């Protein structure tokens, strides 16, 4: 806060500029730290935070500023998920604006990446194992689980090419948010199972086959320069957009609907903050909040478009019942899967049996058994 410190005996209130709006925030007065009240301690930390918050922050060009109806401000950092520059942009933005809330493009099913070390995450991201497939199928069902694994294969391909783990900007946001007093950390993305189930429901059987084929045979080389050149449109999302461009319904469920959900979560976070009161007799004091959103660059235009519109997220949180063709294709895929599995087990068992029987020891035992039969 600007201005001179007042003597301890003078109780006064000084307006503090936060996010461009002047609000009355009680000044914390000097005194014995042992006798400071909880309210005074809160106000002291808040004052320190507001002093660090820049009225005219120097922000990266990847930041879009939005203003809520109550004056709260949202700084949306558009990122490339495999970019060192994006990590630096996130750190700089959080340090400049000292937010009250940080919202990231993650859901509870991906929150584990926030606390993994880089080496472990890099190893995990490169591996697309049978265990991961089983977990995805248990969590999302057969078709959605297989689709999730195919998309993980895309991410693993980029990870392998770049030697860089995904989600670095989210981990940086998590670390920086923990350094800002009273800063909350929100998960702002729609749950993965809902997204994949709605995506699968939007495709016909042949569209699913065509998409799976494209994902299975992805092998184009990628360099770090490619990532930075794609800063205006996230590399992972650009690759996905190229593959799903001919499937408008899939683009709607994976991109457009999540734009709506992310916008809703950012608006929920951007609410005026009520300051604590020393007693119930004191009037309520509120200040506009400051929010930093960390999302893929491809979602920024959709968030801007939806910011001032009425949003209904209930309809994008439900999974429509499968159509007749969908049920038929599901049965066909399951039958093909288990048929292939059964044939593979039969073929392996037969080969193993023939191999065992061809061993000299096995032939000797069979000969002894044959000689021991009565009547021979």
UniProtKB/Swiss-Prot annotation:
Q: Which CDD domains match?
A: TraB_PrgY-like
Positions carrying Phosphothreonine are 64
Q: Which domain of life is it from?
A: Eukaryota
* Molecular function (Gene Ontology), one example: mitochondrion-mitochondrion outer membrane tether activity
Q: Which residues carry this modification: N-acetylmethionine?
A: 1
Q: Name one GO cellular component term.
A: mitochondrial outer membrane
Q: Which GO terms describe its biological process?
A: mitochondrial fusion
Keyword list (alphabetical) reads: Acetylation, Phosphoprotein
What is the name listed in the Swiss-Prot or TrEMBL entry for this protein? TraB domain-containing protein
Native organism = Mus musculus
């Amino acid at each position: 806060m600007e201005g001179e410190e007042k003597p301890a005996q003078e109780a006064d209130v000084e307006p503090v500029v936060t996010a461009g709006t002047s609000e009355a925030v009680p000044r914390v007065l000097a005194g014995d730290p042992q006798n400071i009240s909880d309210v005074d301690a809160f106000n002291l930390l808040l004052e320190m935070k507001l002093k660090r918050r820049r009225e005219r922050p120097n922000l990266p060009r990847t930041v879009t500023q939005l203003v809520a109806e109550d004056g709260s401000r949202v700084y949306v950092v558009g990122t490339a998920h495999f970019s060192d520059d994006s990590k630096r942009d996130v750190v700089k933005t959080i340090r400049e604006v000292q937010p009250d809330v940080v919202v990231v493009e993650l859901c509870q099913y991906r929150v584990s990446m926030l606390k993994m070390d880089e080496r472990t995450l890099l190893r995990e991201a490169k591996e697309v194992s049978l265990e991961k497939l089983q977990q995805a199928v248990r969590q999302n069902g057969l078709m959605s689980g297989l689709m999730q694994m195919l998309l993980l294969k895309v991410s693993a391909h980029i990870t392998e090419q770049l030697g860089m783990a995904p989600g670095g900007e989210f981990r940086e946001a998590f670390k920086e948010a923990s350094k800002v007093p009273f800063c909350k950390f929100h998960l702002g993305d729609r749950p993965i199972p809902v997204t994949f189930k709605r995506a699968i429901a939007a495709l016909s059987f042949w569209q699913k086959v065509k998409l799976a084929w494209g994902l299975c045979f992805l092998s184009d080389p990628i360099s770090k320069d490619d990532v930075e050149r794609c800063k205006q449109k996230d590399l992972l999302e650009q690759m996905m957009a190229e593959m799903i461009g001919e499937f408008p319904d899939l683009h709607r469920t994976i991109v457009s609907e999540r734009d709506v959900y992310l916008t809703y979560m950012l608006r929920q976070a951007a609410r005026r903050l009520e300051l604590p009161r020393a007693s119930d007799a004191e009037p309520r004091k509120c200040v506009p909040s400051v929010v930093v959103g960390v999302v893929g660059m491809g979602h920024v235009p959709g968030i801007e478009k939806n910011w001032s519109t009425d949003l209904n997220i209930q309809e994008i949180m439900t999974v429509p019942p499968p159509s007749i063709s969908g049920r038929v294709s599901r049965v066909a895929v399951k039958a093909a899967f288990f048929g292939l599995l059964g044939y593979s087990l039969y073929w392996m068992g037969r080969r193993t049996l023939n191999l065992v029987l061809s061993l000299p020891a096995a032939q000797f035992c069979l000969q002894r058994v044959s000689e021991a039969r009565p009547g021979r």
